Structure formats: C-alpha cells, structure tokens
Amino acid sequence: YMTVESLFSLRKALNVTILDEPYLNEVILHQRCIKSPEELEEIRAAQAITDKAFLHMLDIIKPGLVEKDLQLELDYFMLKNGATGLAFETILAAGANGSMPHAVPGMNKIKEGDFVTMDFGAAHNGYCSDMTRTVAVGKISEEQEKVYNLVLAAQLAGIDAVRAGIPCNSVDAVSRNMIYGAGYEGKFGHGLGHSLGLEIHENPRFSPLCTTLTEAGMV
C-alpha cells in the first residue's frame, strides 16, 4: 500500500502510465500464491524464530504474571533473536480473555488452571510467520483437557489431509467435522487456516468457501 503522494511521486520519477485495472491486482495476488525457493527460505527463517520464542515462553509463563508483560517478553525475544519486525500485533490472553479470537492483552493475571493462548509471528526480511498455541498453567479440569485434545486432534487431522490438487475447503471440512461430530456444532467460528507470505493473510485459505485447488509451493 502507498499514499497518494507516493503514487504521484513514483509516476513522475519513472515517467510511466499506471494502469487502473482491478483485474491486474487479482493476477498479481494469484502469482504470489506460489512461493519461490527464496521466499520459502525467508518464511522458514521467520517460523524458526517463532518456534524458538514459543519454547522460551514455556519457561516463562506462570501464575501471577500479567498478560501484557508476557506479550512484551514474547515480542522482545523474537526481535532479539533475528526477527526484523513483528508479523502482526501479538495476542497473549489467559482465562476467559483467551476464548476471544482476537483478544487484547491487558493487566489480567495468570491463574492456576488457566489456558493461555498465544497468537504471534515474526517477520524476516519482509516475510511473515503466524502461529497460535494454547498452553495450560498447572492442573486443568477434565472438560478443559477434553476440549484441548479434541482441537489438537482436529488440527493434526487437517495437517494430515493436506496434499497438492485438492480443494482448500476439503481440508477445512476434515477438522470442522471432527469438532462438530464431538458435539460442538457451530463452535468453529473461523476458517481452519490461511496462506501467508509478504502479508500475514494471503490466499488461498482453508475455509468452507475457498474452492481453490492446492498446489506445490503454497504456504
């Protein structure tokens, strides 16, 4: 994205005609669906930083700490360990706040028996990673453990279903049907996943509405 001023400056400096054709945007976005080997390397580097940060937070999270402080610790660790920026604003939420898909970290203190959800990603030379993980603090209830294991099983089943040449919505259906079949009909609020690259949300997406066929090189 650019400002109008930047657009005019670019047009003047290059002495070119800028085409106002909406379809060109779709052509470019489609080309970006397939990542080059160099792009894949950058995304893997971003994800390696994210993985390392997650393992770090497992040693940090404990009862009495505040969501906002933990968010800052997570951000600092990624930036200190090779991230050239944050892929997006980190979400770190506990207890009831963690049940919100896009929670805002606040001064909520972590308690024994809480789930803590982290949605975060590193940027590396312009390319993004994105990972969501939920961890338990101390002993949790049987219901919490049941739901956690169900979501984990649905995630792993979705991953196992991915291969080239299938509709994206068929992957979403694998995980969604497991959740619904366990008695949580209507509780799957989002799509299963989305592509990423230069932007944190790119196409195609593992959602009920996306019929795009998967191809090698998509992330």
Task: Identify the function of each model-found stretch.
Residues Y1-V219:
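Active-site neighborhoods and metal-handling regions in enzymes and metal-associated proteins
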